[in-house]
Amino acid sequence: MENLANRLDACQDKILELYERDSDKLEDQITHWYLMRVESALYYKARECGMTRIGHQVVPTLSVAKAKACSAIEMHVALQQLQQSAYGKEPWTLRDTSREMWDAVPKRCWKKRGVTVEVRYDGDETKAMCHVLWKDIIVQNLSDDQWVKVKGQVSYEGLYYVHEDVKVFYVKFHKDARVYGETGIWEVHVGGKVIHHNAFDPVSSTQEVPATGPLYASHNTTRSPTQAPLGPEEGQERKRRRLEAVGPGPQQQQQQQHQQQQQQQTPTHTPSTQACARTGGPVDSNRTRDCDSTSQNPYRHPSDPDCAPVIHLRGDPNSLKCFRYRLQNGKKGLYCKASSTWRWSCEPENQSAFVTIWYTSVTQRAEFLANVKIPPGMQAILGHMSVF
């Protein structure tokens, strides 16, 4: 017990030295989180041995010590990866590498140079909310785990950044409009400038992906006064592009269902399409198979509004968990939700496991496959599932 107390005192003394030094070197911040790991491990071991106090310090429970240790390990590993990037030589303070900063939106990435953005709902100062716009956001690529720096931006819709040609919103102003406002209109005040509702243009050359949830199909939009009136052909073309972006409407779905029923009455199955309707194929760098796009199986209707496009990832359980974790941190806007790891009950535990990923539309699923690299040794089986 005395040896454990001495080690804990030495560890905490080094932590206090780092606090007093207030260094801006990344090496010192890595050392800080390493010492936090050691401290939590010592607490865990002491509690495991039945100790409730070490000197005058209360030993936390096993669950608390374990949670703090896991948090410190995550921060320590993330900082080690950051040190190997091109931004390892930049100034990094304890505040920049704190857990609170890591968990602040956008979560699980490094942020610097924050600017306050005030959103006034209904144009009333008493109905204002403040958010932080990070000018520098360092996010991790999903394909090669490299850290890259992107610029934080603001629009009438919210706060976002563009990573790998995908616009990722981490704050959406319309959510607070339902709580604080009545008209659904707001003003964005940032850096002495004001962004009004009539300055919002829903048509953009950059592809937009919401931070979470399905694609937002309805927005109260107004054409900017600076835009010239569209002719009939241009207006129809822009309307068609918007409809394609949000997926088929109810009338289109009914037409697709009617066509599907007609095709079922006159089936023309070939051996290859029948086999494809029963099984899914792996998705790799050389080929992509979507069985539902060619199958006439009456139990699968891609146009059925009660069915959602999915991808069943099959592989090693640990690899699936790691891949799902990376998706949640870096590509959450490219899918709707992901399941936990599961298996068929008739298979032994040493067999491959599955993770099912849901999408709001086939377009979103295709965008996911175009932007996300499936790890080697992992199969992606495309299909549809009933919505529940």
Curated annotation (Swiss-Prot):
One of its GO terms (cellular component) is host cell nucleus. It is found in: Host nucleus. Keywords: Activator, DNA replication, DNA-binding, Early protein, Host nucleus, Phosphoprotein, Repressor, Transcription, Transcription regulation. Residues 1-206 are annotated as: Transactivation domain. The keyword Transcription applies. Residues 218-227, 266-276 have a biased composition (Polar residues). Binds DNA as homodimer. Interacts with protein E1; this interaction greatly increases E1 DNA-binding activity. Interacts with protein L1; this interaction enhances E2-dependent replication and transcription activation. Interacts with protein L2; this interaction inhibits E2 transcriptional activity but not DNA replication function E2. Interacts with protein E7; this interaction inhibits E7 oncogenic activity. Interacts with host TAF1; this interaction modulates E2-dependent transcriptional regulation. Interacts with host BRD4; this interaction mediates E2 transcriptional activation function. Plays a role in the initiation of viral DNA replication. A dimer of E2 interacts with a dimer of E1 in order to improve specificity of E1 DNA binding activity. Once the complex recognizes and binds DNA at specific sites, the E2 dimer is removed from DNA. E2 also regulates viral transcription through binding to the E2RE response element (5'-ACCNNNNNNGGT-3') present in multiple copies in the regulatory regions of the viral genome. Activates or represses transcription depending on E2RE's position with regards to proximal promoter elements including the TATA-box. This is Regulatory protein E2.
